[in-house]
Amino acid sequence: MRDYVILTDSCCDLSAEMAAELGVEVLPLSLQMGDRTYRNYLDGREIGFHEFYERVRSGELATTSAVNVGEFEEKMREILKTGKDILSISFSSALSTTYQSSVIAAEELKDEFPDAKILTVDSLCASLGQGLFVYLCAQEQKKGKTIDEVKTFAEETKGRVCHWFTVDDLNHLKRGGRINAATALFGTMLAIKPVMHVDDEGRLIPVGKARGRKASLTALVDRMEATAIDPAGQTVFISHGDCLEDAEFVAGEVRRRLGVETVHINYVGPVIGNHSGPGTMALFFLGSER
């Protein structure tokens, strides 16, 4: 059996330390802010996470770019030359062209590496939902599962990776076209906070609302309580848009209410945070369905 590498992208929002511990390779997406282009590395080496959110708070605007075909080809070729196969797990195709780039790159490399396997997975996930999904696949790899077995596991599992989140400022979603201007205006005036999720097709969908910040954070835990499978026995991921105190509140609630023992907290990275804004709070877990 040939050895293989799990390859993903920086929208997984894993910490650099966890990615290294899992042994996964990570390709960065890019962010254009001011007159500079930054690569969204997991360790924040080109733009720090707090720095990014402070610049957004000050009114700076940014645009983002997916991983392109050439970047995938370069990284995949580097891995294949070591004699290893590749399981590529990408940011949701409903939110980025990164997955499509991985598929094209894999096809382009087939003739050059005819004996290699390059399997691609559309995670239909985002942020630490994608991170949780990659984490689960890496755990299967560590158990000695083959690349085909982990690919099957991935396809069977991705529809149960639940993403629930809220934002603090509706204007960021308005700018990204997720809600209209009137909704943003009245929501802000009334302190309405949306409760949103990523659906079975990998799309970001508003499904409810709460009056006030604390109510919106509690609503995330309510959603987990309603759909989580064996919450006390699973690893839960939480990501935040530079609001660690709120993330710790949610972590405390899932521990208190659901008996969860293992919680990992990290930033919503700049690429996704550019669309959701400072104050984004997201909870990720395995459920019976999304």
Predicted segments with their positions:
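Glycine-rich phosphate- or other oxyanion-binding loops that anchor nucleotides, phosphorylated ligands
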Residues: 57-95, 100-105, 151
